[in-house]
């Protein structure tokens, strides 16, 4: 019980400053993650399946998040150039501008000091990844081709 209670409280402590920082940008952390992932690619585009694998979340969650981003004009869905079954996500100029501003704010306000040194933070990420994997939350992503 101590583990569950401690992890739950740590999650609350880590998420609260992220949510409050993203609120003025009308972004949830899930929406931010999708935008940030797309902005990191060479041309701002990535197949939906690749995005899902890299985010390590359930495909339904990514679809729901992308639906809202498309509705708000921050992401476009495009046809895959070679696979008629696949969808490509593309960040819009508005999405790129928003995620850059949100990233600056997060780096300054929420991520600057989480209370752990770099080694402890890396250890914690590895431990949590093992827990999530054993619980079936994600599998190691397959080797993926470079995004378009």
Spans of features found by a protein language model:
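N-terminal leader segment of winged-helix/HTH proteins
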Residues: 1-25
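Charged, amphipathic alpha-helical coiled-coil/dimerization segments
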Residues: 67-126
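Short alpha-helical "packing" element that flanks the helix-turn-helix/winged-helix DNA-binding module
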Residues: 31-35
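A short acidic, leucine-rich amphipathic alpha-helix
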Residues: 50-52
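Short, locally clustered residues in the helix-turn-helix/winged-helix DNA-binding domain
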Residues: 8, 36-43, 103
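C-terminal regulatory/oligomerization modules of transcriptional regulators
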Residues: 119-148
